[in-house]
Amino acid sequence: MRTDALTMSLLYDYYVELLTEKQRQLFDLYYDQDYSLSEIAAAAGISRQGVHDTLARAEELLEGYERTLGCIARDARLQKQLEVIAQNAQALARIPAAAPQAGAILRAVQEIKE
């Protein structure tokens, strides 16, 4: 398939509910269970080409969802900004008068990350 397995797994985690049940099943067998196309075809009772086409369509859909919705990119930007906020709050914590507010900011950042 076109995109690496790690990227596909990440896309799947974000957008799994937007795939059909059949696409989910085949995707799970291929990417999570590490079945070959032939093994999946035998288990699903369809042709190897049918498995390939279904997986290719699922991959195309997942990539399209990310292009359109951008959830993964947004979350990556959010994580980077949270790190910047945490670093600035740690710097503020060194100022005695700002320490309580800095602590509150750091706790809020930690809650968001969880």
Q: What are the language-model segments listed below?
A:
Residues 54-57:
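Residues within the DNA-recognition helix of helix-turn-helix
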